[in-house]
Amino acid sequence: MKQLIYIAEDEKNIRETLQRFLENDGYEVCAFETGDALLGALFKRRADLVILDIMMPGTDGLTCCRLIREKDKVPIILLTAKDTEYDYVSGILQGGDDYL
């Protein structure tokens, strides 16, 4: 059975490119445009990994990360162009396992 990865990324090109790379590596990938859509799916079917963009409309990636972490220990990677130490620490404190 393939490992399942959920991606929440509002930028279509990034979302589709990341999905394509991961699928080519043999993963099952469900990609979502919003954090809310990812949360709805995750609480119905658990993923093996979650990749979250931090800056999304609606429920942002940090909030999604915190909400996921309250209920699940699934590994979470935060994906963002924000690269300050403050952003990194905020992501880890919200429950992220890694920050790219």
Language-model regions, residue ranges each:
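N-terminal/domain-start alpha-helical segments
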Residues: M1-L100
